[in-house]
Swiss-Prot record:
Name of the gene: pfk1
Cofactor: Mg(2+)
Keywords: Allosteric enzyme, ATP-binding, Cytoplasm, Glycolysis, Kinase, Magnesium, Metal-binding, Nucleotide-binding, Phosphoprotein, Transferase
Protein name, as recorded: ATP-dependent 6-phosphofructokinase
Source organism of the structure: Schizosaccharomyces pombe (strain 972 / ATCC 24843)
Residues that hold Mg(2+) according to the record: D298
Phosphoserine modified-residue sites: S43, S45, S85, S160, S163, S167, S171, S600
Enzyme type, top EC level: transferase
Subunit (UniProt): Homooctamer.
EC number(s) given by UniProt: 2.7.1.11
Length: 942
């Protein structure tokens, strides 16, 4: 050979044959200070610098003072390649294998770090004054460290310092490994050493816990941290070892659709004692973990905060007993705790709802809906016991959603000696109207006003003896914990899991342990122990018979739902009637496409009208039915009895608006003496109300209180954050996508492009993508471009290459029906198939009107009843104050945060609406789009 000589090292490459060893190797070199600078997959096979056989490549670099002193290592994942045998421990490693030797000026610091990470090493000539140190990386490659920058030098760094030659070398000439480990003695974390965040589930399991673990793991990795799972709750924390495992990106694939907790939960008496917590602290420090995200109930979160308060003393004791080194004690002197509330009872104060509560409510309503058919068949009474030792949330919401006849809860106990008569009178009165079934919901903690327990058997015996009813008791028990998480719990768990990681990274030693809560539809952080204290106050208030205070400690929605159930359940009591001159004829009309909750709202409006002395009128088949066929009739109590559980529209609906014939519409209003109008529907209903309000100037019969209750699966009505039917639609889309994703996973290498409805609003596509784990979503707000498709296809190529045919490897793309006129669902599917080059396949799926759902979800039923009752109250206020012609008497009744809002339709139309696009100007859910991309691994892969 002749010519130019070698000037330096361009790069060094290592090859792994399994993904586990590949990831372990990346982690090993990152601890040494190497930074990832490039990532490649099979889609980059045309890049000459990438090995054609590589399924994955990551290039890592460490910078020196100039390019010749820098080091680049190419890591390659090539299945089937032979692995190196480990060196014999009883011999000198550097004589058995070739080695790559890095310069490092302070080998004593290095030995301390290797010991802390439990990495085996050999030091020469000895550990007290080493000149060279050797370790094996996870692939079996021998890596050396020397404090001689020049291998031909006879003097090491310490001797060179005497001659002034060390000033440049100590700054890290060849590698930032020097700076990385040298800073360990002056900061909480060595530079280049990742923060390690552990997640654990504790206490009773609840649906949505797996979504928490998935979100925490992926967001932690995305934020540059290492994610760990602590298996079997506090028991795993005390045992340590294999109970604490690192989570890789792919380990949590498919977890969104799983119920319970896949990392386990168990009771642990040992953790309640200091010796148990001491072992737990040792296990965490050994694993390098100083942050824990705990998902559980108030007991689990209390235990976590006690652990944090004990931490400094535990670390000192471990240091004093030499169980850990002084360096470890300094490095892990603080513990960060973040709490997430996983509880089906929804019994935690300071948050509107807990993870798992709505899924449990789904199970209860499914059971009661099923029981109803057999109860009607045999004219039976059923006593259904639900969970809730100190909280009646499940019982109240279940009673409201299923139309139960009576409910017993701990916060509002039945009056001792009187509840028996109240129950019997209530059930017998509806039986006289022709009702064939009786449903009584009982919380397991139900009591009377003297704190005597009320059991289902007590109620059964009463009904049998007094009313001679064929009565059965059904205890749902752990059925309430089972099943897949519902759409809301998946969304809530994901959003709170994301914020929990951010809370860890923002935490300081002086910050109180936060609890991630949701208040007013926003994720918030609350002081953990304050929330626990308020939760315990509820039980204390009940014990002290301070029942009003116990109700005050619950969230405002709870009391509102209880009042709604009372107002729509008990038979007309004339003592609650308004004065005769204030009684109204209230018309109810459905406008637009069917949506879950329309019938529930109608039922609640009818029953509350009757309870207040008003006359409810149903307009059949929308405005066209009203104008062409004079389709209007009164509704009675029993007419709407089963409507709360029915989907669709019992009185018929279409998209016609009153501008078909505004004058004739006004005549019909006058003819039937309509005093108030409830319009239940979507954007067409919003348009109809706007038209009627604008026509008041010409038609006096429209000068009455009017309101729209938004009901559309698209959730595109301005003036509210949620429309009735959107939760039912999300659950229908979720179940559909879970099914096709299962098919895609079975085929291993398949992606489904699923078209969802929503009009020009991307709500269903965006939130649907979040709760189903979609790889990509396309919405009208963002449109579709060729570059967008190219990036998503490249991402799919890389994903399928990395998954290498493993289970749960199916991919999903959600496309809104109006996202693009050019890039249709079929076109996108064909483009993906063509670009895949048979590495994977693409199929399209269009659920169509299946998305409207069957029976409405409990959330839509409860919201519908609440809004309908508030509408009647609003009409009464307008009537009493003679506001019929005031713009404020034509309103959109919506949900903003946890409260019910009344917004003038004129103001909403002028300030909050994109009329041409038929959607609100500001959508609270838009930020979720970026989160979908992150959790799909796009930003991570980049």
């Amino acid at each position: 050979m002749s010519g130019e000589t070698v000037h330096g090292i361009s790069c060094y490459s290592v090859v792994a044959n399994t993904e586990d060893t590949y990831n372990q190797t990346l982690d090993f070199y990152q601890k040494l200070g190497f930074k990832k600078v490039a990532s490649f997959g099979t889609s980059d096979s045309d890049n000459a610098r990438v090995c054609n056989e590589s399924l994955r490549e990551d290039w890592m670099h460490v910078a020196g003072n100039n390019s010749a002193e820098s080091v680049t290592i190419k890591f390659r994942l090539v299945p089937g390649e032979l692995s190196l045998s480990p060196a014999a421990e009883d011999s000198e490693w550097r004589g058995q294998k070739s080695s790559l030797v890095f310069y490092y000026p302070n080998l004593l610091d290095l030995l301390k770090q290797l010991s802390a990470d439990a990495i085996k090493y050999q030091a020469f000539p000895n550990e007290k004054k080493p000149d060279e140190v050797y370790v094996e990386d996870p692939l079996g490659n021998l890596i050396g460290f020397s404090d001689r920058y020049n291998p031909f030098a006879h003097a090491n760094l310490k001797k060179s310092e005497e001659s002034g030659a060390a000033s440049n070398l100590e700054s890290g000439l060849a590698t930032p490994v020097v700076e990385t480990l040298k800073k360990a003695t002056t900061s909480d974390k060595p530079a280049g050493v990742k923060k390690k965040i552990a997640v654990m589930t504790s206490g009773g399991d609840s649906p949505g816990m797996n979504a928490v673990v998935r979100a925490v793991a992926r967001i932690a990795i995305h934020r540059g941290c290492d994610a760990f799972a602590i298996y079997e709750g506090y028991e795993g924390l005390v045992q340590g070892g294999d109970m604490i495992k690192q989570l890789q990106w792919g380990d949590v694939r498919g977890w969104l659709a799983e119920g319970g907790t896949l990392i386990g939960t168990a009771r642990c008496m040992a953790f309640r004692e200091r010796p148990g917590r001491l072992r737990a602290a040792k296990n965490l420090i050994s694993a390098g973990i100083d942050s824990i995200i705990v998902c559980g109930g108030d007991g689990s979160l209390t235990g976590a905060d006690i652990f944090r308060s004990d931490w400094p003393g535990l670390v000192k004791e471990l240091e004093d007993t030499k169980a850990i080194t002084p360096e470890q004690a300094k490095l892990y002197r603080h513990l960060t705790i973040v709490g997430l509330v996983g509880s089906i009872d929804n019994d935690m104060s300071s948050t509107d709802v807990t993870i798992g509560a709505f899924s449990s409510l789904h199970r209860i309503c499914e059971a009661v809906d099923s029981i109803s058919s057999t109860a009607i068949s045999h004219s039976r009474a059923f006593i259904v016991e639900v969970m809730g030792r100190h909280c009646g949330w499940l019982a109240v919401l279940a009673a409201l959603a299923t139309g139960a006849d009576f409910v017993f809860i701990p916060e509002r106990p039945a009056e001792v000696g009187k509840w028996q008569d109240e129950l019997c009178n209530s059930l017998s009165s509806v039986r006289k109207l022709g009702k064939r079934k009786s449903i009584v919901i009982v919380a397991e903690g139900a009591i009377d006003s003297e704190l005597n327990h009320i059991s289902p058997e007590d109620i059964k015996n009463l009904l049998v003896e007094r009313l001679h009813l064929d009565t059965r008791v059904t205890t749902l028990g752990h059925v309430q914990r089972g099943g897949i998480p519902c759409a809301y719990d998946r969304m809530l768990a994901t959003l709170q899991g994301v914020d929990a990681v951010d809370a860890v990274l923002a935490s300081t030693p002086d910050t109180p342990s936060p609890m991630i809560a949701i208040n007013g539809n926003k994720i918030n952080r609350k002081p953990l122990m304050e929330a626990v204290k308020l939760t315990h106050e509820v039980a204390d208030a009940i014990e002290k018979k301070q029942f009003a205070h116990a109700m005050e400690l619950r969230d405002p929605e709870f009391a509102d739902y209880l009042h709604t159930w009372e107002g729509t359940t008990f038979i007309e009591d004339e003592s609650h009637f308004v004065p005769k001159d204030e009684r109204m004829r209230v018309a109810i009309i459905h406008v637009g496409a069917p949506a879950g909750g329309m019938n529930s709202a109608t039922r609640a409006a009818v029953r509350y009208c009757l309870n207040r002395g008003h006359t409810p009128l149903a307009i059949d088949n929308g405005f066209s039915g009203f104008l062409r066929h004079d389709s209007i009739h009164e509704l009675s109590w029993i007419d709407v009895d089963e409507w709360c559980i029915r989907g669709g529209s019992e009185i018929g609906t279409n998209r016609d608006t009153p501008d078909l014939d505004m004058g004739f519409t006004a005549f019909k209003f006058q003819q039937h003496k309509i005093d108030a109008l409830i319009i239940i529907g979507g954007f067409e209903a919003f348009t109809a109300l706007s038209q009627l309000e604008s026509a008041r100037v010409n038609y006096p019969s429209f000068r009455i209180p009017m309101a729209i209750i938004p009901a559309t699966i698209s959730n595109n009505v301005p003036g509210t954050e949620f429309s009735l039917g959107c939760d039912t639609c999300l659950n229908a889309v979720m179940e559909y996508c879970d099914t096709i994703k299962q098919s895609a996973s079975a085929s291993r290498r398949r992606v489904f492009v699923c078209e969802v409805q929503g009009g020009r609003s991307g709500y269903i596509a965006t939130v649907g993508g979040l709760i189903t784990g979609a790889s990509a979503i396309y919405t009208p707000e963002d449109g579709i471009s060729l570059d967008m498709l190219r990036k998503d296809i490249d991402h799919l190529k890389a994903t399928f290459a990395l998954e290498a045919g493993r289970n749960r490897a199916g991919q999903l793309i959600l496309r809104n029906e109006c996202a693009s006129k050019v890039y249709t669902t079929e076109v996108i599917g064909n483009i993906i198939s063509e670009e895949a080059h048979k590495r994977f396949s693409a199929r399209t799926a269009v659920p169509g009107h299946v998305q409207q759902g069957g029976n409405p979800t409990p959330m839509d039923r409860a919201r519908a009843a609440r809004l309908a009752m508030r509408a009647i109250r609003f009409f009464e206020t307008c009537r009493a104050n003679d506001l019929g012609n005031d713009p404020s008497s034509a309103v959109v009744i919506g949900i903003r945060g946890t409260g019910v809002s009344f917004s003038s339709v004129a103001d909403v139309e002028n300030n909050e609406t994109e009329i041409e696009m038929r959607r609100p100007k500001n959508a609270w859910w838009r930020d979720m789009h970026n989160l979908v991309n992150i959790l799909a691994g796009k930003t991570f892969a980049d």
